[in-house]
Amino acid sequence: MDAWKEITKTTENDGVSTCSLSSIAFDPYSELVWTGHKNGQIKSSFGPSLTSYTQFIGHEGPVHQVLPQERGVFSLSSKSLRLSNRKGTIRWRYQDSDCIDYRAMFYQSRNNPEVVIGGYHQKLTVVNAERGISIHKDKNVSDIFIMRRNRLLCCGSTNGEIILRDPNSFQPVNKVVAHTGTISDIDTSGNLLLSCGYSLRHGTYMLDPFVKVWDLRNLSSLVPIPFPAGPTIIRMHPKLSTTAVVCSCSGQFHIVDTGNPLDAKLMQIPLTSYLTGMDIASTGDAMVFTDVEDNIHLWSPLENPSFSDLKLPIQLPNTSTETVQLENNDPLNSIGLPYYKDELLSSWSKYLIFDVGKPILDSNLLIAKQISENSHPVPQEIKSFHRNQIIEVPWLNRKLISEGATPKFHSERQKDIMSGNDIEGSASYFEEIEDTISGPDSIPKFYQRPVIKYSKFGIEDFDFGFYNKTKYAGLETDITNSYCNSVLQLLSYVPSFSKAAISHSLGPCDLMECLLCELGFLFAMLKESTGRNCQATNFLRAFSNSSFAQSLGIVFDDYSDGTFPDSFVIQKFTKFMLTEISRIADYEDKKDGTSFPVSFLLKSFCIPEMQTYRCGICGITSQKIKSSLYIIDLHYPSQQLESILSFEWLFKMSLDRRVDLPPGWCEYCLAHQPFLLRSFIRSLPDCLFINTQVKHHEHWKLWARKNWLPKKLHLRRVNDTMQCVSQKISNLDKDQQSLSVYVLRGIIYEIRQNGEEPHFVSTIRVSDNTSSDNPDDNRWYIFNDFLVKEVTEEEALTVHGPWKIPIIVYYEKLDTKIPQWDEVSDYTLLYQPYSLNKNPPINKIQPLTTDEMLYPKMLVGIDSEFVALQQEETEVRSDGTKSTIKPSKLSLARVSVLRGEGPNKGLPFIDDYVATDDKVTDYLTEYSGIHPGDLDPDRSPYNVVPLKVAYKKLRLLVNAGCIFVGHGLQKDFRIINLLVPPEQVVDTVDLFFLSSRQRKLSLKFLAWYLLDEEIQLTEHDSIEDALTALKLYDCYDKLKSQGKLEETLDNIYEVGRRFKFRPPSVASMSLEDRNSYGDESVISNQTN
């Protein structure tokens, strides 16, 4: 408040008469200041410079009050009420022959907007604001000098009384005797009523040296505000509900808090006369004063203040445009373009050029062709070319990147590269495709649902990298309930959430279906992926099995019943996840040794809420209930949504809600009385999740406003509740340390495309430093499943059209500090057996001993077996070709890990069969070696463990830096949902592979050719396959050290081609077959 200063001073004096200004008011809907004059003129000035905008004659006599509203500008004189538009054109005029002298008016917007007027004629009149006719009159009322509207209509009179009237019936409810003389001014804010006026002292009416303050709830008098200079004008601050501006006629004014009247800031307007009027802009950024000499003084703490929050555009007069002189050397960018709404032709994509076909031939030429079969009609434009000239047809050689382009499969791209047919100009990344600009009806492709295509080689052949050239991972969609991807992506970039989940997943946890552990595993993959696509298979499987989630209706079974997730399902899922964390925290509290990461995580988003029930008659609060929220729902008023000025106001109302309840029993009144339920937030955590609750188009229109969603939220605690203030108001707050600043970090949107089910995307500000102003630390990305793309901040925050609906908003407290704790991995599972079996299982392993500590680059052999939960879905086209609609759904059934070095090399230390509650459609026994009953802990003779245990063992090996040796590990790790860094994978299918042959060799064939071993004779055994992979790796090292690797690879493919890459029995090979490749056996030639 100390920074207030005069920034503009203008005069309305015409040089003939003085004291012509009679009223002044800011326009709450546009950047205008309105003034009324004693000669009936009404003027408006634009902007901080107070440039003249409009001027017109409104009345025959003095203009007592000007009241700008959305419908226009109301002006009141002694005999008439007029409504004009902002250009000065009259809409209607109201006059009453019985009126003596109108003095005050007030606009109230109900179902039918009305203007209430009063004056010195003992009559209160209500005029319809649309038609300008009287709809209600009250006679025999006291004189009304000034009116203010709050919960009650406050009418000040010349006898010192303030009559409080019901705003609906306009009947007197109560009255306050404020002064013994006339009232000078009154104003209201919230439950406060302030007045200043005259009192009789020593036989003379003198200004009271203080401002009187009342509480309208019980009409009790509060501590008055001292003002020795004598108050004549009072205005309550429109943003600070307890702050008042008190002015004297000498030009002094105080800015004072009614709760602390002694702490006032005194300022002086440089006047040579007396002050006659003042007003405060609805933004609170400017004040305007008028004096007897018709000067207008504009005060503000800003150099360029704003008068209106809405800033509706004003219509400027038409001006003739000058002819633009353009010379050859003049730059084109010096010539401006006219305003346009539609897209310019120059910005159309070159791919919007279409072939319209050949020109229409003349009918006479067609008749001529019928007469002579040897003649052919030729268009006249072609006849104009000579025979040695070439007609250029641009579309023949044009190479387009189709707007609906999809990436080529890896196999197709590799084939094109090998054959030299790779098309020049084909897109390597999604961002290279020509795309549209976001608009009310145009949906760019990066918002549309990306679709996975399948080839005969399965999903591994799909090029996910086409949709993501960033270092941040996307999530795949071919999984049941993958609608959760947008929420999972947002949570992964909440630092406290990600760190606590990963730490929890590494430690001991007894819950076998722990969603926090699954989140930790997923977040670790997303963190380490460096842009590779990931999938939330294990998390979504555990989520789908949750009975609590099923009861909430947020688990879907491949949408088989025709229902699809919508925005409210996403909001329910988010609330479910935060509630689930609370449940896990309660479980940890009951155990010995509470897990600090979980308790810290709960505090980071848990919101304490208080609910009170107050009797509407006796006013006694009868019950207080404390509860916890995890996400805040926005609550919109049922009517007059257009009156919501900002997101901060809406959020403030949602933090402190009041609801009228039906009558209940009051213990103090001993009767059934109406109750008021109040729900308010006492404090806010570091992580703030907000449900937008956009339920219909009127709600959406608020979010479509420009700059509706603030990048920062400023909150402070007032008494017992949290309040949200705008940034401008927060800058005026004297106690900056009491403010909490929250930074916008992410938004989840629902994308609606015509004819398709909705899907969800998240826009996230990916940054490790929320307080940084460095642009590199404030980059926004859109996560649309496996499509990830950097976007501008404007693109991320703007709601372009009805197809883009905000669902969840996430704010993070500025400078949030996450405590450091040791992320200690629990390796107990690797050293101690774990089993679900009721009977002791067959022991095929020797667990690691304390002497066999894991270390980086330690070799381990691995192989996995899988069962099918869902068969492949295919379709046969009319040409006989078959395409995959959906691949088979596989689940981990067995995993074996062997020591790859040391004295116990080849000895397994993990051989787990994985229990599953899902229905197995095919055990794939021929390829997996799994039989019915092997995965049932009650019947299986083998060691059966939960999926979480098997997965965590592998995760621990990855974290320890072990190198996995196996055959076809890419597909195995994908189904297991385990991300292993490439440097920790040795895949024998790639070691013995020639890209020029375009065929990868089976483990069975390589073992026959290189090791002289026959494996997989009956069924697959993961221990045998893992051991074989270790031997092949040793063979590879030996061949490479001898310099025979390339020669051996060529021979392998030659032999494979002869035997169709199927190993025959060595004993059954004829002598001719053996000798055709040398004097010695085929195998011995390669191994010696």
From Swiss-Prot:
PROSITE patterns tied to this protein: USP_3
Gene assigned in the entry: pan2
GO terms of molecular function: cysteine-type deubiquitinase activity; metal ion binding; nucleic acid binding; poly(A)-specific ribonuclease activity
Start and end residues of each Exonuclease domain: 860-1033
Organism: Schizosaccharomyces pombe (strain 972 / ATCC 24843)
GO biological process: mRNA processing; nuclear-transcribed mRNA poly(A) tail shortening
Cofactor info, note text: Binds 2 metal cations per subunit in the catalytic exonuclease domain.
Full protein name: PAN2-PAN3 deadenylation complex catalytic subunit pan2
Catalysed reactions, semicolon-separated: Exonucleolytic cleavage of poly(A) to 5'-AMP
Domain USP: 443-814
